[in-house]
Amino acid sequence: MNDVIIRQLAHLIPYQPLWEAMQTFTARRQSQTTDEIWFLEHEPVFTQGLAGKPEHVLNSGNIPLIRTDRGGQVTYHGPGQLMMYLLLDLNRLGLSTRTFVRTIENTVAESLQEWGIPAQGKETAPGVYVDDKKICSIGLRVRKGFSYHGLALNVAMDLTPFSCINPCGFKGLTMTQIQDYVNPIEMDAVKRTIIPLFLKNFGYNQPAIMVETSLEFLIDDHLRSFSEKLGERETVTNSRQN
């Protein structure tokens, strides 16, 4: 069993600084760094993946469009959508990228089935679907065995912005959400359902759960930890030189 830290961000988070925080964490983590999962909701934003094609953005309007370094095509993030950013050491977990994606899909589908929603993954396209409607999108990046980015689960949101794009590069793809099947639905209830399943399916111990009131605190925490490790290295180096 491995350890994991779960961070729940308490406010709507803009995409750009969160993306930069993921990159910083991933670039500076080491083999002994504890895995983290970040739960949050974003301010409205379209994100274009590495494989993204301009023709799939039909009309972004006043919503920002950010080209990012995850896999996949264009999608939408906004309030009422649960983001789970998975900052994991796949080598330590013994997972290939393909198995990692399938485990995410199966875990999300299993959590939705607990709400009576007949969700499942598809062999032909990443994500989780209810019939032919997409309820959860997955976009990842793996660098040196470390994953970042993650999944977007539609809970109770305004789905209208999805009509401004071809979601995930599929023309005519219909998006759905938990609220269409379970109403009312609370975000915290969804988290309480999905967290234990992630722990079980990925082999994690009971997590340390931290509620963050600002992204700045999150970034500062990682930078401080990195600085402390550098200080320890300098102390060891100096002692050897002396």
From Swiss-Prot:
Residues 31-206 form the BPL/LPL catalytic domain. GO terms for biological process: protein modification process. Its main location: cytoplasm. Its EC number is 2.3.1.181. Pathway: Protein modification; protein lipoylation via endogenous pathway; protein N(6)-(lipoyl)lysine from octanoyl-[acyl-carrier-protein]: step 1/2. Substrate binds at residues 70-77, 137-139, 150-152. It holds the Pfam family LplA-B_cat. The record marks 134 as: Lowers pKa of active site Cys. It catalyses: octanoyl-[ACP] + L-lysyl-[protein] = N(6)-octanoyl-L-lysyl-[protein] + holo-[ACP] + H(+). Keywords: Acyltransferase, Cytoplasm, Transferase. GO terms for molecular function: lipoyl(octanoyl) transferase activity. The active site is at 168 (acyl-thioester intermediate). It comes from the Bacteria. It is found in: Cytoplasm. One of its GO terms (cellular component) is cytoplasm. InterPro entries: aa-tRNA-synth_II/BPL/LPL, BPL_LPL_catalytic, Octanoyltransferase, Octanoyltransferase_CS. In the reaction, the free carboxyl group of octanoic acid is attached via an amide linkage to the epsilon-amino group of a specific lysine residue of lipoyl domains of lipoate-dependent enzymes. Belongs to the LipB family. Catalyzes the transfer of endogenously produced octanoic acid from octanoyl-acyl-carrier-protein onto the lipoyl domains of lipoate-dependent enzymes. Lipoyl-ACP can also act as a substrate although octanoyl-ACP is likely to be the physiological substrate. HAMAP family: LipB. PANTHER family: LIPOYLTRANSFERASE 2, MITOCHONDRIAL-RELATED, OCTANOYLTRANSFERASE. This is Octanoyltransferase. It comes from Coxiella burnetii (strain RSA 493 / Nine Mile phase I). The gene is lipB.
